[in-house]
UniProtKB/Swiss-Prot annotation:
This is U3-scytotoxin-Sth1a. It comes from the Eukaryota. Disulfide bonds join 36-50, 43-54, 49-59. It comes from Scytodes thoracica (Spitting spider). It is found in: Secreted. Expressed by the venom gland. The presence of a 'disulfide through disulfide knot' structurally defines this protein as a knottin. The keyword Disulfide bond applies. GO terms for cellular component: extracellular region.
Amino acid sequence: MGFAKQFFFLAVLLSAAVMCSMAEPAQERLIESIACIQKGLPCMEHSDCCRGVCEALFCQ
């Protein structure tokens, strides 16, 4: 009985770790799509802009 509980606990921990590692990239993409900067506003990198073009510190 003790081994079965330990095995079940290990399986739950492993599946939780896998689910968290798969969810992080999706969460990052969602945040980037919500938090992107509109055309004409200041930016620092191409990834800051909704269309991905940052020229002369402004989204194009």
